[in-house]
Amino acid sequence: FILADLGVSSMQIDNPERGFSYKYDGPLDLRLNPEAGISAAERLRTVARDELEGMLIENADEPYAKEISQAVTRALRKGKKIDTTFALRDLIAEALDFLPKDEKKEAIKKSCARTFQALRIDVNNEYEVLEAFMEKLPDALAPGGRAAILTFHSGEDRLVKKSMKGL
């Protein structure tokens, strides 16, 4: 039996130095392994507006992907640094400033969570890692063995379901 829990550790999320949460100010990192790859701040500096918009849609189903990606690229063009979690959070809030006052607070909170999720998935190549895991899963299971995979968002869910159909 194989059990795969695809969720992020709360120890990582609750540590401001890891940059996983918009609720705590810290460096905008989001890497599961801080020694590997590039941080989310570095990724934002190199991503094109349309690529960022696609990332927000594909990795997090973000309904305000266009507005957020425009705000991020506009800020970067003006020389603004987006190196901290609060800097990104504030840009998201600015991007959603057009919303009615009674909807804004909740929308900002949800868009922050989705944006941080989308960036985390991107900088850690989480979908590629999950695809590789799913490809190797049949070889790791004993004949007649079972696997349970706990997903936490629709992107993971879609990928796992698609892979399971091929088994």
Predicted regions located by residue number:
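S-adenosyl-L-methionine-dependent methyltransferase catalytic core, i.e., the SAM/SAH-binding region
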Residues: 1-167
